[in-house]
């Protein structure tokens, strides 16, 4: 196979290139070539380097025969040759992985291959402030910090101090060598160069650019002086995240193990030489290794492990709840709620509100978090278990088992709760009785993992094919880190619900594929995470719409293609780096905002918080920029007319979509004292809801300046209005009475081009 030959050839070339030069000098040159000197202006989408390149070279140098004792690199040494050989080896291996995954017969083979590729190439998947938030909660408590001290030889506070000192000392050492070169230049830039000056410049240049090993390493003594900790404690911290040189393997064997997933530098990202110097291969000290190393150390002690596991689960649940509640501001929130679920083999309806013995017909169950916001219920399950080492190295069977324990269990538990709420409109809670949830019309599920599984979570359709999750209702599967970042960006309840709807919509799940959840979030923020809806399905849902043409169906088939989601986090990175204090250049927070006025309307509905505000606000945000602008333009005309004549005016807006057919009726009254305006407007809305078979309709009464005065909501569908008399319907729908005018509006609602037909149903009336 061509890829196999290229891999062997590249590794042999790499072995020769790294055979003799000083280890840390050589690694320093490669680091200078592959790692940006600063995050200022860094854009991941434009970066051509990968942390895996430096790690592969470091793994081979660690196991070479010369060890850490070799002369400095010759000035003619070209690190570019080393980098090119390493990148060729990695690329060839990725081709082999791709071939293996597509030829595998297990339903998870493709996903396992994608997981291995991500584990090989992606590093630094946590923003500093978010990582600190999680680690502080997890390790900052006294009991866990004491466990760390007992089993690792240092406390969490010790680790934090060493981390800070390591970064500061590295920067000082590195800048010192460059400052000497800069000093000589500034002092003598106008002087005639002498032989002595040339020698000094050459020596400074050689130290800074060809012998960077000294300036890129630190010692425990340096860290001790800077941190104020003892040298022994600093050594314990550094050694916990360091690997020594080892000649028991050959460089080729080390490279092959690295590419198989046995990466010694993934968790322990320091390389230590025989003189006690530490070279940082990448990222902050222990950035990806603290939790796995600590858990590995305490797992043999059963009592300590059990106590920590319980604490770990509580922390993950608490952090998930805290950040979701901050955005959603639920009307009711239940953490660790206990309820009765159906006994296996029995129907969920046996546990309806009329059940007289729920403890007999059901069995105890617990949900991590249930939130009710308006008529929306959100079920959240949190899993703190880790993915095993063998799964990370490509074991398909072990990956399947680990995913079933995390994603699969979270999905089934959330789905079980959602099914009970949808079918019974409530739950039986032990010792408390019936929990009425009859107002809930829509149920969504979130599965949160403490482990970063982005490359797996982003492929919901593959999880369905692998039977980790059944077809049908899909949860949003997200890591705790990405959930925290998402809630910092989508800080409106309506925005987060819209993302939740789109992200778990079956059309989106099967049409978008990626390896990073935050790329999906930023794609959504940019207004690009959407699909044209199946016109046949939409017409079946809304039969009063015009008949579809062959051109409609042909366009849908043409556009129904898989989209590979690349890197979209550049703006997010810039903002996070700035807020974390890693760069000086100010950066704006990415936000799902528009300048069409819809944001102000959504905020006004949220502030009023009348029934139906959340689902309707989300439906309004779901439109395209053109559709939102059309709605706001129509509202502007409505208010202008109200200010002009002081009469009642109304605007009907249809919002058909994949999550139901909703509508909004905006209206004004006869000035501030028109007490009957809302009731009359609500009757008109009900008639239109019945006429067009609308699922839910929000009525919004505005004053002439656009402030919300009151709302009314019907969320149980048009069928509940059949008890109305024909006379009342005709009265409520008085669109063409003397003194009233009606006109067509620009189509609204997001259903692709199909919206044009339903737009004909959007009407405005002006009534005296």
Task: Give the predicted meaning of each segment.
Residues 353-358:
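Hydrophobic multi-pass inner-membrane translocation pores used for secretion
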Residues 331-336:
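Conserved RecA-like helicase motor-core motifs
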Residues 368:
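Cell-envelope/extracellular polymer assembly enzymes that use nucleotide-activated donors
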Residues 1-329, 340-347, 360, 397, ...:
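Acidic, metal-dependent phosphodiester-chemistry machinery of nucleic-acid enzymes
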Residues 402-438:
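Acidic, metal/cofactor-coordinating or nucleic-acid-engaging core segments within structured domains
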Residues 363-365:
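SMC-family hinge/dimerization module
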Residues 371-379, 383-389, 653-663:
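Active-site beta-strand-loop-beta-strand hairpin of nuclease catalytic cores
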Residues 388-406:
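A solvent-exposed, charged loop/short amphipathic helix patch at secondary-structure junctions
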């Amino acid at each position: 196979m061509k890829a196999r030959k290229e891999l062997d050839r590249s590794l042999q070339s790499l072995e020769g290139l790294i055979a003799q030069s000083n280890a840390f000098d050589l690694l320093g040159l490669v680091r200078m070539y592959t790692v940006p000197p600063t995050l200022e202006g860094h854009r991941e989408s434009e970066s051509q380097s990968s942390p895996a390149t430096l790690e592969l070279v470091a793994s081979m140098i660690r196991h070479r025969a010369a060890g850490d004792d070799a002369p400095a690199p010759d000035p003619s040494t070209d690190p570019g040759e080393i980098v090119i050989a390493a990148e060729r080896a990695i690329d060839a291996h990725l081709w082999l992985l791709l071939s293996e995954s597509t030829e595998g017969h297990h339903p998870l083979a493709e996903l396992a291959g994608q997981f291995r590729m991500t584990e090989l190439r992606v590093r630094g998947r946590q923003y500093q402030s978010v990582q600190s938030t999680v680690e502080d909660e997890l390790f900052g408590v006294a009991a866990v910090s004491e466990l760390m001290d007992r089993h690792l030889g240092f406390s969490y506070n010790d680790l934090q101090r060493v981390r800070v000192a390591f970064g500061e000392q590295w920067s000082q050492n590195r800048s010192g060598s460059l400052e000497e070169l800069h000093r000589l230049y500034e002092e003598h830039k106008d002087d005639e160069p002498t032989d002595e000056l040339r020698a000094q410049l050459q020596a400074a240049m050689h130290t800074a650019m060809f012998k960077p090993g000294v300036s890129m390493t630190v010692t425990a003594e340096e860290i001790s002086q800077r941190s104020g900790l003892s040298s022994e404690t600093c050594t314990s911290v550094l050694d916990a995240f360091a690997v020594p040189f080892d000649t028991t393997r050959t460089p080729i064997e080390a490279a092959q193990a690295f590419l198989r997933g046995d990466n010694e530098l993934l968790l322990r990202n320091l390389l230590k030489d025989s003189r006690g110097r530490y070279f940082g291969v990448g990222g902050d000290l222990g950035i990806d290794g603290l939790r796995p190393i600590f858990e590995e150390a305490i797992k043999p002690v059963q009592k300590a492990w059990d106590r920590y596991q319980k604490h770990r689960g509580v922390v993950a649940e608490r952090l998930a709840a805290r950040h979701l509640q901050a955005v959603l501001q639920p009307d009711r929130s239940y953490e660790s709620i206990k309820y009765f679920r159906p006994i296996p083999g029995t129907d969920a309806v046996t546990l309806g509100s009329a059940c007289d013995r729920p403890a007999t017909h059901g069995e105890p169950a617990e949900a991590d978090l249930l939130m009710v916001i308006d008529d929306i219920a959100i079920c959240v399950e949190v899993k703190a278990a880790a993915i095993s080492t063998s799964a990370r190295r490509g074991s398909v069977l072990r990956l399947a088992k680990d995913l079933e324990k995390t994603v699969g269990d979270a999905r089934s538990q959330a789905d079980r709760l959602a099914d009970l709420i949808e079918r019974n409109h409530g739950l039986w809670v032990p010792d408390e009785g019936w929990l009425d949830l009859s107002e809930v019309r829509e149920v969504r599920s979130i599965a949160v993992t403490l482990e970063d599984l982005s490359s797996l979570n982003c492929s919901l359709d593959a999880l369905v094919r692998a039977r980790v999750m059944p077809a049908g209702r899909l949860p949003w599967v997200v890591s705790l880190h990405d959930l925290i970042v998402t809630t910092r960006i989508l800080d409106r309840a309506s925005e987060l619900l819209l993302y939740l709807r789109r992200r778990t919509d079956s059309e989106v799940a099967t049409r978008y594929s990626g390896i990073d959840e935050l790329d999906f979030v930023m794609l959504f923020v940019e207004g690009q995470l959407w699909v044209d809806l199946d016109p046949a399905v939409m017409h079946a849902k809304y039969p009063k719409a015009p008949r579809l043409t062959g051109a409609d169906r042909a366009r849908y088939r043409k556009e129904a293609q898989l989209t590979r989601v690349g890197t979209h986090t550049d703006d997010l990175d810039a903002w996070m780096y700035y807020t974390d204090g890693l760069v000086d250049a100010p950066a704006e927070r990415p936000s799902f905002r528009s300048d069409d006025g819809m944001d102000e309307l959504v905020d006004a509905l949220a502030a009023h918080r009348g029934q139906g505000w959340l689902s309707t606000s989300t439906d309004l945000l779901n439109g395209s920029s053109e559709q939102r602008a059309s709605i706001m333009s129509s509202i502007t005309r409505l208010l202008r007319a109200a200010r002009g004549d002081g009469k009642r005016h109304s605007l009907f807006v249809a919002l058909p979509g994949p999550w139901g057919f909703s509508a909004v009726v905006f209206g004004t009254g006869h000035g501030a004292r028109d007490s009957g305006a809302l009731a009359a407007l609500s009757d008109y809305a009900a008639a239109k809801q019945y006429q067009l078979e609308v699922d839910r309709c929000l009525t919004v009464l505005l004053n002439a300046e656009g402030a919300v005065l009151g709302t009314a909501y019907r969320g149980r569908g048009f069928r509940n209005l059949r008890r109305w008399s024909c006379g009342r319907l005709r009265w409520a729908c008085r669109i063409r009475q003397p003194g009233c005018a009606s006109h067509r509006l620009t189509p609204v609602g997001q259903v692709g081009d199909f919206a044009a037909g339903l737009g004909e149903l959007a009407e405005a009336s002006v009534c005296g």
